[in-house]
């Protein structure tokens, strides 16, 4: 497969296109979830460590854990191994095509659906049920095809008292622009694109699936209005996209 063909395959992604990627045997496990190999291969253990450092309820024995859009790279395998060791119950929500890439376990329920559009009744039936919720690297796709308000309301509803939700790896164009406006950012860009190249910075442009500071702050406001504490957290600097992505954490009081 040529590099041009691969770029085309990994562009303009949505729920249905991810189904196609999941069944494409010419792609690696990282490419099936929309990443070129160099962004994820050999790096997901560090990502998992960063997730665990924020979602402290993942260390609980017998916890109920929900992963929205787990994909099929190394991360869901790490989550499932952790769950098996701690006697946790896991629910994975994704397309059937993506879920088929993951092993079956007695402690894991696979739910084929588009969250939150197709899970409204399920969310009501599982109110206050989950001690840990993870939605990593997929929220910007969900936001294009669904209501951000419905997503936030559903997460807040599903969280158990004392539960923690991580909406992780959110691309923030404002954060990106700040980085590439700095000497460090220009050097980073030139290391990857050549010494005569300069990063494009447009403070007034936001593409579909991108968030800016206003969007991030509005998500915090929505969660807090739903009775849940909400925070913006940086990623570990060792992570591949830490200089232009960030995480949001929800915490429900006991």
Model-derived segments and spans:
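C-terminal alpha-helical "lid/dimerization" subdomain adjacent to the S-adenosyl-L-methionine
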Residues: 171-223, 234-237
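Conserved class I S-adenosyl-L-methionine
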Residues: 62-71
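Conserved beta-strand signature within the Rossmann-like core of class I S-adenosyl-L-methionine
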Residues: 162-169
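A conserved beta-strand element that flanks and buttresses the S-adenosyl-L-methionine
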Residues: 134
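A short, conserved alpha-helix within the catalytic core of class I
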Residues: 142-154
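N-terminal, positively charged/glycine-rich alpha-helical extensions of SAM-dependent methyltransferases
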Residues: 1-33
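Class I SAM-dependent methyltransferase SAM/SAH-binding core
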Residues: 72-119
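Class I SAM-dependent methyltransferase Rossmann-like catalytic core
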Residues: 20-55
